[in-house]
């Protein structure tokens, strides 16, 4: 647990294959091979659904709290990586190399963060408004 500015809490665990702190610091971006493997898995899931009559498949990824509210992260740890984050790198890979409809919602949700709080201050999850705005985007895209 990291206590940020204005007492915002950030949970930065390390668990199998994941390291939220390294994600925030941009030190563990996916390799080209890892991106290709993940993209292939998503395409297989899409194909499974399409083979069963689903007419539309769109894969969404919501950003984490550290991404949207980095202004509340404490002075340390600093971002030390150069360039894009892990998910930004993967989103670019998907756009350039995959025919799966894919959307990383960072830019879309960021425009709401100046006016609204989309994540809980003392929790890692989106609040109801963040969930609603995300859901509305999905419904809008699917209709």
Which residues does each predicted region cover?
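Extracellular glycan-modifying ectodomains
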Residues: 1-143
């Amino acid at each position: 647990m990291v206590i940020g500015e204005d007492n915002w809490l950030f949970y930065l665990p390390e668990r199998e294959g994941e390291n939220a702190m390294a994600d925030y610091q941009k030190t563990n971006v996916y390799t080209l091979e890892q991106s290709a493997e993940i993209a292939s898995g998503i395409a297989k899931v899409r194909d499974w659904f399409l083979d069963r009559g689903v007419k539309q498949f769109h894969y969404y990824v919501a950003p984490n709290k550290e991404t949207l509210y980095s202004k509340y992260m404490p002075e340390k740890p600093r971002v030390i990586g150069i360039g894009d984050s892990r998910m930004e790198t993967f989103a670019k890979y998907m756009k350039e190399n995959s025919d799966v409809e894919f959307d990383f919602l960072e830019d879309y949700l960021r425009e709401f963060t100046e006016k609204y709080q989309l994540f809980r201050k003392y929790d890692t999850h989106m609040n109801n408004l963040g969930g609603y705005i995300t859901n509305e985007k999905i419904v809008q895209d699917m209709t």
